């Protein structure tokens, strides 16, 4: 059989010049984050399918590269559902592996624990320009510190790194699940619905507020709750615009 020279669709070869740049940037990342006390860790590329499908990954869970069971565990004749065929998959981000890692090793780690991860992740997405099925992610996390100081340190470390890399005039977007929960509760959603609501809300950049409202409605959520929820976000956008103008005029 002739050798297929091109990489699998959605994958790419890294040429020496690009690899040199990547190594330089990763070196800066490690140097900067280590300076803030973050410790590099490594987790397996393959995780238990139950962990990857825990409904915390949003749309990414639909993009898992799943791995068939092997040997005696794989029985095509008796398999009735996908769960009978699959027991593991490639990680789609670094958050799920970190949760498992910390749960398994917390007793032997300092508190708080400041973790740094850099590594490839995989998503069975539709390949398009600038969008690949394998790409690198970098995560920093502080576990065991519930104070806002931990959040501030994450922002400070990241903005320091971006400055070293050469970025200027960038904007840091901050998300706090506690705020989202408070808004959802005020709008009348049940707590059991939060995860589903947030998964849809995560699409806002792609489909806009109107698209989010339509998808919430198509999933059977109460119209009154949707209207109140969307009203909060419209108010936030107006306030954000006013704050940006005010800061620009002041500073």
Name each region found by the language model:
Residues 45, 120, 174-178:
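A general secondary-structure junction signal
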Residues 50-64:
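Glycine-rich loop at the start of a catalytic domain that most often binds anionic cofactors/ligands
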Residues 18-38, 47-48, 80-87, 93-109, ...:
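Positively charged, Gly/Ser-enriched RNA/tRNA-binding surfaces
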Residues 30-31, 42-43, 57:
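Generic N-terminal leader/targeting and pre-domain segments
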């Amino acid at each position: 059989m002739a050798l297929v020279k091109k990489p699998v669709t959605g994958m790419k070869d890294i040429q020496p010049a690009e690899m040199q740049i990547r190594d330089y940037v990763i070196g800066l990342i490690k140097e900067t984050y280590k300076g803030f006390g973050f410790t590099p860790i490594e987790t397996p590329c393959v995780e238990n399918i139950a962990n990857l499908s825990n409904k915390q990954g949003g749309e990414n869970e639909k993009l898992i590269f799943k791995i068939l069971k092997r040997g005696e565990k794989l029985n095509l004749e008796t398999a009735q559902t996908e769960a009978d065929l699959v027991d593991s998959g490639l990680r789609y981000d670094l958050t799920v592996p970190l949760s498992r890692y910390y749960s398994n090793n917390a007793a032997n780690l300092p508190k708080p624990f400041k973790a740094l991860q850099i590594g490839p992740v995989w998503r069975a997405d539709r390949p398009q320009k600038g969008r690949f099925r394998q790409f690198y992610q970098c995560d920093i996390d502080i576990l065991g510190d519930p104070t806002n100081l931990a959040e501030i340190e994450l922002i400070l470390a990241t903005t320091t790194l971006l400055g070293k890399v050469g970025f200027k005039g960038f904007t840091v977007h901050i998300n706090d699940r506690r705020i989202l929960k408070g808004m959802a509760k005020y709008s009348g959603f049940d707590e059991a619905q939060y995860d589903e609501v947030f998964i849809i809300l995560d699409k806002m950049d792609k489909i806009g507020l109107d698209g989010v409202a339509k998808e919430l409605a198509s999933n059977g959520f109460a119209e009154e709750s949707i209207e109140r929820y969307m009203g909060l976000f419209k108010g936030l956008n107006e306030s954000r615009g006013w704050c940006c103008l005010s800061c620009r005029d002041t500073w």
